[in-house]
């Protein structure tokens, strides 16, 4: 959400841009009331797209979702259906998927007023050849790309989208099983519909071009742009006072390594957990003063890892898990961290790595996906499967001040942080040229 929010805030400052939303019930784009834009961007208003089932002409994929949800309520039946499709899932993996989806539905939402779509729109947009629709979010959730394709043929407008990554195509093992086919269909449709795509890294852009070539899809015009690394809350940016952030009590007076990410298989928390507990068990880190901090909600297929961390006395004492924190609290965690960690198996960008470097911190990272593009020569790279290597590097960064400060000085001397203002300027300028 951060990318969409930051770009939208800056788009609101331009007289050449307006805000719209796709109404799936009426299969058209509608203009958002200018009076509602600021409250929406500030999180004061949450727009509800819910409609009675008889009013919603759902795209074909929704019927697949309904059928899957019905079968998923019966794990052994779901397991049998997947085996027929040539895919094998254990009952534990199926339970993880059910838990992940239940947590996603019940996750705390920002404190805001929920209003129906009809209350924030002021009519259909008059589409023509001079119109460009820019989609900054995930089209598969609330849009019908096939219907948008038909609209394009009638009205001649252009359609641009942000591409974050192609994980479902490249590493489907790291995607919630029920979403794999849906997202593969989504990308196939998106690249036919979109006239231009802005990718969040050159790595993602290369992946997109390879995908289009592989499947014989005419590649849309494309470019890449970097993401901003300044953590600025909506309240702070608007000048509104916000409560001062404080470190969690369990981190007061501690030194800690920080990993900001949803806990899920692709992010590779297990390697850090094993590397960390190994160092603790061997007495190379001090349980009285050293902490490993995970910031992010628990995702899918990590039930065993969470259970293991909860049961492990070393992890109970020295690994801190945080979620649903504010931007101000995240900013404070970055400022006080000794080092940043990013062992992911694949990233479309790796925003937390950029944010950590923006705070001048020493970082350990894998080279996967776009991470080397973000980190350059300012980061120490370790294979994501090298548990021993991660353990030794973490110990060295805590215990060898010379090694850690050497990285910090290199970051301070040569790193050029990208602000969200600069990222937005590049995004809109490069998109204009496509």
Question: How should these model regions be labeled?
Answer:
Residues 1-434:
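Carbohydrate transferase catalytic cores enriched for Leloir-type hexosyltransferases
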């Amino acid at each position: 959400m951060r990318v969409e929010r930051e770009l939208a805030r800056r788009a609101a400052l331009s007289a050449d841009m307006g805000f719209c939303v796709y109404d799936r019930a009426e299969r058209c784009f509608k203009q958002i009331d200018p009076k509602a834009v600021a409250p929406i961007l500030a999180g004061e208003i949450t727009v509800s797209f819910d409609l009675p089932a008889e009013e919603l002409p759902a795209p074909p994929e929704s019927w697949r979702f309904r059928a899957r949800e019905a079968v998923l309520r019966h794990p052994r039946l779901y397991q049998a259906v997947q085996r027929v499709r040539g895919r094998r899932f254990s009952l534990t993996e199926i339970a993880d998927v059910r838990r992940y989806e239940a947590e996603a539905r019940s996750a705390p939402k920002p404190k805001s007023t929920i209003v129906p779509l009809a209350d924030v729109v002021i009519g259909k947009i008059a589409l023509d050849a001079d119109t460009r629709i820019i989609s900054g979010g995930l089209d598969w959730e609330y849009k019908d790309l096939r219907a948008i394709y038909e609209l394009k043929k009638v009205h001649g407008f252009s359609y641009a989208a942000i591409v974050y990554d192609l994980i479902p195509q490249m590493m489907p093992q790291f995607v919630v099983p029920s979403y794999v086919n849906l997202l593969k269909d989504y990308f196939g449709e998106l690249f036919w519909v979109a006239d231009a795509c802005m990718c969040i890294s050159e790595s993602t852009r290369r992946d997109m071009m390879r995908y289009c070539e592989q499947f014989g899809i005419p590649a849309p015009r494309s470019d890449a742009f970097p993401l901003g690394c300044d953590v600025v809350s909506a309240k702070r940016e608007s000048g509104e006072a916000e409560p001062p952030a404080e470190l969690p009590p369990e981190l007061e007076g501690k030194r800690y390594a920080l990993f900001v990410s949803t806990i899920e298989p692709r992010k590779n928390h297990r390697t850090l957990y094993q590397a960390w507990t190994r160092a603790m068990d061997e007495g190379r880190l001090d349980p009285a003063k050293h902490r490993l901090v995970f910031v992010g909600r628990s995702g899918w297929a990590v039930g065993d890892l969470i259970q293991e961390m909860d049961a492990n006395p070393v992890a109970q004492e020295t690994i801190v898990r945080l979620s649903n924190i504010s931007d101000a609290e995240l900013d404070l965690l970055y400022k006080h961290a000794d080092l940043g960690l990013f062992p992911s198996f694949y990233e479309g960008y790796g925003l937390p790595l950029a944010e950590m470097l923006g705070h001048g911190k020493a970082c350990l990272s894998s080279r996967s996906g776009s991470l080397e593009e973000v980190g350059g020569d300012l980061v120490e790279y370790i294979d994501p499967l090298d548990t021993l290597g991660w353990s030794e590097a973490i110990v060295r960064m805590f215990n060898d001040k010379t090694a850690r400060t050497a990285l910090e000085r290199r970051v301070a001397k040569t790193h050029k942080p990208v602000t969200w203002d600069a990222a937005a300027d590049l995004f809109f300028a490069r998109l204009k040229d496509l």
